[in-house]
């Protein structure tokens, strides 16, 4: 079967032709460059209307095929700009009817993942998807691509574009910022915001624009802007590696064209003993071949036809039932013998201290971060974590005892506790309702004491005698804001949805039974909606 795919979710218009053996027969495309400002949805729609037919002709010529050789037409139904999506869907309907072949709409984001897997050979990667409209950490789990981390406000691509536009450099901003950043090694401090496996770019955007207005050198701002944003992306990705245990990382999306981001992710992956993949540059950005590929993978006669060809501008990656992945993948990361676990920001090492068996949490230097930022983060987090672990006990929340702290090495020497992690006992015969209610009660106490865990996942809660023991406060802080408490709960909710999606709602409700604050619970939905594609 041969599929022709039509892409046009934003400013890029693309046609791709792919066959069912995975051969990419043609990839053709063009891009709208606005004279001023960003992408206007109607301008994008008009641009696509003008270029789709010529690009189809070009793709057929490149593939040495005629239009009658096409067996299936697929199109990007979302997420994206409404007017642009409608133009693409109209073109796809017309083409499929004219040549008498099935029509199927597909998810744009999953297209990036699948073309990446096809062109790199990655089997079951953790995917960092970075584009103008999306920033997501994606993992295939239990029949869907799950979003285990994402931006809580604007996407990295939009962040770069908006900075460039606001200071008068034009659009698209990514290549412009990258070019200026290459002119210097100097950096300044900018906001660094990571919340579990989620992140936020609005603060750093505002700060960078203000620095420019204050007269700070443009090259220095651009280098700092890139280094800080990309370090945040690397950190949430390594947190996801630690949580999922996957041994492959795939970078995709338009921002993957940035050489500094690729370099930083490569370094991070090497330090975590996992493989790094990135598709050829022509398949990083939006393209028709990724739409054709997903069209073939998801082809189902019952899902085809004009009646199913509606668009969805807010089409989430995790809304799609992934029926084409059948394998049950096993992952193995080969760690050095002296490392018990490789955490996101620390090596976990077993040792002896004062004739006691202990756990040494050693915050290792992050080679992907600039030295000054890395030293600051590791020192601050080591001191803050030690204080939070100790203060939790004031509110009846169980944490490991601290025996010693070495701020020079960024080490915390902790009580060794022989107990399974929460995700290891979820499918056992233990009283799960009681356990999750207990966790909710303890997190409520923590929050009443104005302690925010910061990375509240099932990997950071030990269970002993049906009671929780909280570990790893590396992203923790003191706060009484509903926003921070709600984010804590959202991180926990997402972690459940990743590891046990079929029971996640039930388990989270048990948790909420113990968490006695309706205002915080209501805040979860508000924060969650910000991650939707806009």
From Swiss-Prot:
Native organism: Methanosphaera stadtmanae (strain ATCC 43021 / DSM 3091 / JCM 11832 / MCB-3)
Enzyme class: transferase
Limits of the Protein kinase domain: 335-534
Subcellular location field: Cytoplasm
Protein name as annotated: Probable bifunctional tRNA threonylcarbamoyladenosine biosynthesis protein
Role summary: Required for the formation of a threonylcarbamoyl group on adenosine at position 37 (t(6)A37) in tRNAs that read codons beginning with adenine. Is a component of the KEOPS complex that is probably involved in the transfer of the threonylcarbamoyl moiety of threonylcarbamoyl-AMP (TC-AMP) to the N6 group of A37. The Kae1 domain likely plays a direct catalytic role in this reaction. The Bud32 domain probably displays kinase activity that regulates Kae1 function.
UniProt-annotated binding residues for ATP: 340-348, 361
Enzyme Commission identifier(s): 2.3.1.234, 2.7.11.1
GO function terms (MF aspect): ATP binding; iron ion binding; metalloendopeptidase activity; N(6)-L-threonylcarbamoyladenine synthase activity; protein serine kinase activity; protein serine/threonine kinase activity; protein serine/threonine/tyrosine kinase activity; zinc ion binding
Region (Kae1): 1-324
Superkingdom field: Archaea
Claim: Iron is one of the keywords in the record: yes
Main localization category: cytoplasm
PANTHER family reported in the protein's UniProt record: TRNA N6-ADENOSINE THREONYLCARBAMOYLTRANSFERASE
Active-site residues, record numbering mapped to chain: 455 (proton acceptor)
Positions with a binding annotation for Fe cation: 108, 112, 129, 286
Enzymatic reactions: L-seryl-[protein] + ATP = O-phospho-L-seryl-[protein] + ADP + H(+); L-threonyl-[protein] + ATP = O-phospho-L-threonyl-[protein] + ADP + H(+); L-threonylcarbamoyladenylate + adenosine(37) in tRNA = N(6)-L-threonylcarbamoyladenosine(37) in tRNA + AMP + H(+)
């Amino acid at each position: 079967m041969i599929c022709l795919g039509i892409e046009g979710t934003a400013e890029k218009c693309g046609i791709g032709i792919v066959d069912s053996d995975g051969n990419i027969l043609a990839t053709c495309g063009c891009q709208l460059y606005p004279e001023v400002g960003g992408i206007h949805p109607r301008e994008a729609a008009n641009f696509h209307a003008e270029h789709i037919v010529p690009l189809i002709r070009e793709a057929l010529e490149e593939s040495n095929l005629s239009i009658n050789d096409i067996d299936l037409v697929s199109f990007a139904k979302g997420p994206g700009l409404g007017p642009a999506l409608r133009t693409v869907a109209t073109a796809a309907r017309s083409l499929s009817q004219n040549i008498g072949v099935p029509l199927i709409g597909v998810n744009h984001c999953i297209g990036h993942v699948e073309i990446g897997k096809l062109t790199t050979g990655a089997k079951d990667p953790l995917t960092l998807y970075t584009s103008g409209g999306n920033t997501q950490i994606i993992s295939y789990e239990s029949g869907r691509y799950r979003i285990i981390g994402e931006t809580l406000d604007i996407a990295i691509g939009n962040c770069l574009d908006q900075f460039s536009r606001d200071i008068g450099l034009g659009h698209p901003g990514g290549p412009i910022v990258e070019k200026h950043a290459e002119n210097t090694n100097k950096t300044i401090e900018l906001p660094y915001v990571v919340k579990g496996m989620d992140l936020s770019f609005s603060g750093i955007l505002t700060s960078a624009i203000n620095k420019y207005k204050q007269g700070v050198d443009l090259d220095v701002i651009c280098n700092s802007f890139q280094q800080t944003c990309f370090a945040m992306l690397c950190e949430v990705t390594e947190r996801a590696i630690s949580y999922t245990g996957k041994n492959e990382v795939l970078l995709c999306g338009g921002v993957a064209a940035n050489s500094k981001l690729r370099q930083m992710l490569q370094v991070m992956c090497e330090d975590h003993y996992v493989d790094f993949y990135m598709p050829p540059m022509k398949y990083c950005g939006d393209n028709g071949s990724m739409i054709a590929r997903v069209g073939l993978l998801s082809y189902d006669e019952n899902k085809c036809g004009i009646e199913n060809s509606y668009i969805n501008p807010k089409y989430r990656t995790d809304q799609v039932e992934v029926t084409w992945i059948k394998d049950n993948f096993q992952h193995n990361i080969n760690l050095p013998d002296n490392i018990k676990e490789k955490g996101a920001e620390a090596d976990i090492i077993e040792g002896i201290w004062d004739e006691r068996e202990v756990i040494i949490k050693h915050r290792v230097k992050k080679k992907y971060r600039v030295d000054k930022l890395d030293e600051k983060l590791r020192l601050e987090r080591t001191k803050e974590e030690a204080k939070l672990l100790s203060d939790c006990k004031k509110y009846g929340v169980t944490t490991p005892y601290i025996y010693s702290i070495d701020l020079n090495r960024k080490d915390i020497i902790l009580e060794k506790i022989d107990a399974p992690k929460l995700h290891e006992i979820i499918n056992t015969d233990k009283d799960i309702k009681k356990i999750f209610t207990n966790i909710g009660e303890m997190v409520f106490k923590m929050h009443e004491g104005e302690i925010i865990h910061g990375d509240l996942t099932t990997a950071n809660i030990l269970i002993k005698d049906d009671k929780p023991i909280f570990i790893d406060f590396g992203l923790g802080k003191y706060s009484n804001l509903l926003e921070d408490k709600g984010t804590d709960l959202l991180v926990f909710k997402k972690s459940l949805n990743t590891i046990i999606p079929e029971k996640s709602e039930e388990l989270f409700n048990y948790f909420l039974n113990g968490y006695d604050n309706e205002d915080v619970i209501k805040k979860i939905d508000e924060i969650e909606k910000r991650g939707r594609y806009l």
